[in-house]
């Protein structure tokens, strides 16, 4: 960051934590107090979702390394119909490892939370196994992120069919961009699909990139101004589905389905 205090997003590489003995020390020295680690259930399932054998074991090693360096681990777990029973075992594992007690010893609290994640980008592929709200294990309800705001897809559709507003992807005062190694640029709140691409720094130039950002002139932002949530729910919603969504995640799911179709037309 330039001329301001750096922002910390509590994200770090667990791959590097277990391979670089200086990495945790570096994190501590720059003021990191909590690092989030992501599970997808038990060992085999977590390895498969992450795409690397041994990933689950590395997450547990990273947990130990963080604690040894005065940094609290925070566990999150993504839940779906396939892994719900495995995810239900994670609080027991945290208790077995005495993570709450050990975090208190370093002046922090241990946090574990569960959610289904958004349903855009790669997560769209998991829609068929998205968790049914009534199938969420009761033991996980206290850990479920914003459970009180969770709805079924049917409830989301019913609500949005009455909504004449457009999806709002206008820029706020603070804009964060993702820039790839080939200089393509996206907003950080989207996934990196062609529909959301702002442009290319080398091909389009900084002035044109800034114009597109300031004028909100990207394919996705233009399309958002042309359609209402009621239209999205009518075209793409499943009024019989009991899949669990927050209303915000469901709005994003519908709009991205629409974007994908419009972009391919």
Can you say where each PLM-predicted feature lies in the sequence?
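Alpha-helix C-terminal capping segments
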Residues: 1-4, 134-136, 248
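Conserved SAM/AdoMet-binding glycine-rich loop
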Residues: 1-38
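A generic secondary-structure micro-motif detector
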Residues: 12-13, 52, 80, 209
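Short, charged, surface-exposed secondary-structure boundary motifs
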Residues: 21, 45-47
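Short, flexible coil/linker elements and helix-boundary hinge sites characteristic
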Residues: 21-22, 98, 236-237
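Alpha-helix boundary recognition
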Residues: 28, 67, 95, 211-214
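Radical SAM enzyme [4Fe-4S]-AdoMet core and its adjacent flexible, acidic
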Residues: 33-34, 40, 48-181, 186, ...
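Flexible mid-to-C-terminal extensions adjoining Fe-S/redox cofactors in radical SAM and related proteins
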Residues: 184-265
